[in-house]
């Protein structure tokens, strides 16, 4: 029995545990509620840690000023002033709004990356890399389907 428990713990540490502990997030919904409120694509990314295909996001083409909110809970995540064209196929930002995201280690798919989660609902947004422009040198590579754009009034 002890060998089985050890094997399970080792597997979880190598492959990750899926979602962050949902007790840490303000917005709490059942999986049935998430499925009802999100489109299938949003659910796959935000709740299933999926990745949308590159160059498919409508957010790539938004040029106007405004704010990018979490599609799952409406948390303000990024502003258009922090958006830049990375050429990667996903909306990219050099910094989030303070306190709006949580970073955790993602060891899925045989690599180690820094996963970006919404600080309010724990939804998977994308990953952050250290190859971005100034002033931070960071590139928050975000799935556009996880975002809702609200134009500046």
Region spans (language model):
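A short Gly-Trp-Pro
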Residues: 25-26, 35-37, 41-69, 75-153
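Short, contiguous pre-domain boundary segments
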Residues: 19-31
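Enrichment for repetitive, rod-forming helical segments
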Residues: 9-10, 42
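Sec-dependent signal peptide recognition
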Residues: 2-8
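Hydrophobic h-region of N-terminal signal peptides that target proteins for export
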Residues: 10-18
